[in-house]
Amino acid sequence: MCKVKMKVCEGQYLRSSVTLESRQLLDLQVGKSVLALFKASAATVSKDKTEDVSRCFLFGQVSRLPQKDKGGEVTLRLPNGLNVVGFIRGNHGLEVGSEAYIQIPEQSVVIALLG
């Protein structure tokens, strides 16, 4: 297995674990542009960043969320304008415009080639 670190925006990265064979088949090299995918149901949105080394954290601003007393899908806009979606539990205390973190387990991040 090898770890792949992908820059999402300034100071924010996603990590993934791939087999050596996958690394070779994808011809992964430093500086190569790739597409990183994860299911929204694998990502958790929260107001605070927890210290969990097995997860990647991205920081952004809430642009869409469910009612405060209900959980559901939340969209965060990252500083570079990208939108990412994750889930949050009910009674979350966030509002549109709030700053929040999305936590993604590195084993949930899949790498694909562009084009």
Q: What is the meaning of each model-derived region?
A:
Residues 4, 14, 43, 74, ...:
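A broad, low-specificity signal marking well-ordered, structured residues that form hydrophobic/aromatic
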Residues 6-10, 38-40, 78, 104:
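Flexible glycine-/small-residue-rich
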Residues 12-18, 37, 82-89:
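A short macromolecule-binding patch
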Residues 20-65, 70, 90-115:
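Glycine/charge-rich catalytic "coupling/switch" loops of P-loop NTPases
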